[in-house]
Curated annotation (Swiss-Prot):
SMART domains: 7TM_GPCR_Srsx. Residues 348-360 have a biased composition (Acidic residues). It is a multi-pass membrane protein. Residues 70-79, 139-161, 232-257, 317-418 are cytoplasmic. Belongs to the G-protein coupled receptor 1 family. The gene is SSTR3. Glycans are attached at residues 17, 30. InterPro entries: GPCR_Rhodpsn, GPCR_Rhodpsn_7TM, Somatstn_rcpt, Somatstn_rcpt_3. The chain crosses the membrane at residues 44-69, 80-101, 117-138, 162-181, 206-231, 258-279, 294-316. GO terms for biological process: cell-cell signaling; G protein-coupled receptor signaling pathway, coupled to cyclic nucleotide second messenger; hormone-mediated apoptotic signaling pathway; negative regulation of cell population proliferation; neuropeptide signaling pathway. Homodimer and heterodimer with SSTR2. Heterodimerization with SSTR2 inactivates SSTR3 receptor function. Phosphorylated. Phosphorylation increases upon somatostatin binding. This is Somatostatin receptor type 3.
């Protein structure tokens, strides 16, 4: 048994015919020497159904993210550029699920060796692109929080597009072994990777290779970035910042929280997969039907991660939430008429609250100033009683809207004889 994937149940007990290592579109070979009819029924009906549901949800969610970023963002930010590439990788990652569901339902690969190689290569490229994008996003968060001034000229949308293109190229280079060794070997009916002799050494080396470059290496960089961010935030926690700096820092913290949530979900969904495969290299896992559900869950989690990212964006980002509403509720005239009061999707809810608080504080300051002027006017022995300034009266009318219906003269008299 090699790199886990319950895409088909091998009926052979020969180790040489076991499916090969590729996450996650390799087959789970040798689950048992003779699978039960009940196990075949579950594999042929329930598993394809789960894959198709995940595929539909993932395609719809990531398509919505791509549309919102491209249509409802006038000038995409650096983070939005990376989110766009992450959503594109997740969407292409979902395209391999129908082939996987067909192999589960039919118990063999019906699409030929060329499609096997193409599907596995595209699947691998998008898998590595996802983790590489998360790594780049974490580095971007580090630069934005720890070195905001020095990194300003590098943290631009054109630079982010160049970095994203480099990420796709790097992913294509990393999966070259998949292009070379994947296919449908003679005498077998499943799509997997066929290694030269010694096959066990090649298989173990490839598992370590993919785990190091596709998970543990990037995870180390991500953890280092957020460790430095925490140190920076704690060291600057007691400083007094100007209002503009405070607003920018709050915005950076919101974006950082969203990126951390996406990274945490990725680790949660992919960690069991890689850990179980590394354990399988050291000590072969049990090949019993009782463990089939566990193996399926471990392999299904990475696909579920790709369809869960849009949900995270909707919950954690106000701009994406507003963009989703504009797209999904577009036919409603009522919602459309209320859109201008909500504001553009690039504006966060917290920023609206900050502006409202700022306006209230400014109005409060004006009110205090007005009260001081009114008290000076009403003091006995001053000449201000006979000629109160019109500017004071107009401001008092704004502060006292219930008196707006009276004339200007009466308002002035009320101010004079308070």
């Amino acid at each position: 048994m090699d790199m886990l994937h319950p895409s088909s149940v091998s009926t052979t007990s020969e180790p040489e015919n076991a499916s090969s290592a590729w996450p996650p579109d390799a087959t789970l070979g040798n689950v048992s020497a003779g699978p039960s009819p009940a196990g075949l029924a579950v594999s042929g009906v329930l598993i394809p159904l789960v894959y198709l549901v995940v595929c539909v949800v993932g395609l719809l969610g990531n398509s919505l993210v791509i549309y919102v970023v491209l249509r409802h963002t006038a000038s995409p930010s650096v983070t939005n550029v990376y989110i766009l590439n992450l959503a594109l990788a997740d969407e292409l990652f979902m395209l391999g699920l129908p082939f996987l569901a067909a192999q589960n339902a039919l118990s063999y690969w019906p699409f030929g060796s060329l499609m096997c190689r193409l599907v596995m290569a595209v699947d691998g490229i998008n898998q590595f692109t996802s983790i590489f994008c998360l790594t780049v996003m974490s580095v971007d968060r580090y630069l934005a929080v720890v070195h905001p001034t020095r990194s300003a000229r590098w943290r631009t949308a054109p630079v982010a597009r160049t970095v994203s293109a480099a990420v796709w190229v790097a992913s294509a280079v990393v999966v070259l072994p998949v292009v070379v060794f994947s296919g449908v070997p003679r005498g077998m009916s499943t799509c997997h990777m066929q290694w030269p002799e010694p096959a066990a050494a090649w298989r173990a080396g490839f598992i370590i290779y993919t785990a190091a470059l596709g998970f543990f290496g990037p995870l180390l960089v991500i953890c280092l970035c957020y460790l430095l961010i925490v140190v920076k935030v704690r060291s600057a926690g007691r400083r007094v910042w100007a209002p503009s700096c405070q607003r920018r820092r709050r915005s950076e913290r919101r974006v950082t929280r969203m990126v951390v949530a996406v990274v945490a979900l990725f680790v949660l969904c992919w960690m069991p997969f890689y850990v179980l495969n590394i354990v399988n290299v050291v000590c072969p896992l049990p090949e019993e039907p009782a463990f089939f559900g566990l193996y399926f869950l471990v392999v299904a989690l990475p696909y579920a991660n790709s369809c869960a990212n849009p949900i995270l964006y909707g919950f954690l980002s106000y701009r994406f939430k507003q963009g989703f509403r504009r797209v999904l509720l577009r036919p409603s005239r009522r919602v459309r008429s209320q859109e201008p009061t909500v504001g553009p999707p690039e504006k966060t809810e917290e920023e609206d609250e900050e502006e409202e608080d700022g306006e209230e504080s400014r109005e409060g300051g004006k009110g205090k100033e007005m009260n001081g002027r009114v008290s000076q006017i009403t003091q006995p022995g001053t000449s201000g009683q006979e000629r109160p300034p019109s500017r004071v009266a107009s401001k008092e009318q704004q502060l006292l809207p219930q008196e707006a219906s009276t004339g200007e003269k009466s308002s002035t008299m009320r101010i004079s004889y308070l």
